[in-house]
């Protein structure tokens, strides 16, 4: 119980992300007692399991599919929280989409980009592979299905849709689980965005 209180204290004083990081440190600490390591491992696993449930929420796939089918003229970049979920998003709207992430071969990724750029598909689904140094001038809608505690990735995703073209606007839709950690993250993330109008 004493050890569990230690994690509750960390969570309250440092924030959940820091408590999670401290749990990882204890698991690696050679001087930590077996009880401390066990509690840290349980805490770490529970956070990961909760995140997986949120990341793979089936309602996100249903909402994503509805959005894609309701916007046939849009050029859409979609972002999932994990490679497997990104593939599930892409598979839900085949043949309109292809996935692009680190588990794909260079040949597969190149083919997906070419299909998107030449208009064969109008949806490109990614995880983090498109976050930095990548631009898709024709994209005009973003659907974000995976939220993280870091706002930078969201800023990069939004910026990719609207930058470099004067007068161009991008529409970004964020699918998140209500009353979850995702809702807190999205609200914190949008505070850091400038020249972007958001409705939550």
Describe the function of each predicted region.
Residues 75-80, 84-134, 153-155:
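Conserved helicase ATPase core of P-loop NTP-dependent helicases/translocases
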Residues 81, 102, 147, 175-177:
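Cofactor-binding loop segments of dinucleotide-utilizing enzymes, especially the Rossmann-like FAD-
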Residues 123-125, 132-148, 153-156, 163, ...:
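A short beta-strand element within the Helicase C-terminal
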Residues 160-192:
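Conserved segment of the helicase C-terminal RecA-like domain
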Residues 198-200:
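Long, largely alpha-helical accessory region at the distal end of helicase-like NTP-driven motors
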Residues 1-71:
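Interdomain helical connector at the RecA1-RecA2 junction of SF1/SF2 helicase-like NTPases
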Residues 60, 85, 108, 150-154, ...:
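Helical mechanochemical/support elements of P-loop NTPase systems and associated helical scaffolds
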Residues 73-75, 169:
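A general structural motif
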């Amino acid at each position: 119980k004493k050890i569990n209180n230690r994690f509750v204290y960390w969570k309250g004083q440092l924030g959940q992300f820091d408590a999670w990081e401290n749990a990882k440190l204890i698991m690696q600490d050679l001087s930590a007692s077996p009880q401390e390591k066990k509690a840290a491992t349980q805490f770490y696993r529970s956070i990961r399991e909760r995140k997986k449930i949120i990341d793979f929420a089936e309602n996100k796939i249903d909402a994503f599919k509805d959005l894609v089918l309701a916007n046939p003229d849009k050029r859409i970049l979609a972002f999932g929280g994990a490679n497997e979920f990104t593939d599930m998003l892409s598979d839900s709207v085949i043949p309109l989409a292809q996935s692009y992430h680190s588990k794909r071969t260079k040949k597969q990724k190149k083919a997906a980009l070419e299909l998107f750029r030449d208009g064969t598909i109008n949806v490109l689904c990614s995880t983090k592979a498109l976050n930095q140094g990548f631009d898709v001038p024709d994209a005009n809608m973003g659907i974000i299905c995976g939220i993280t505690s870091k706002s930078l990735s969201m800023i990069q995703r939004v910026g990719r849709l609207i930058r470099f073209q004067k007068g161009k606007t991008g529409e970004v839709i964020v699918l998140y689980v209500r009353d979850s950690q995702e809702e807190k993250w999205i609200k914190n993330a949008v505070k850091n965005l400038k020249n972007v109008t958001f409705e939550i």
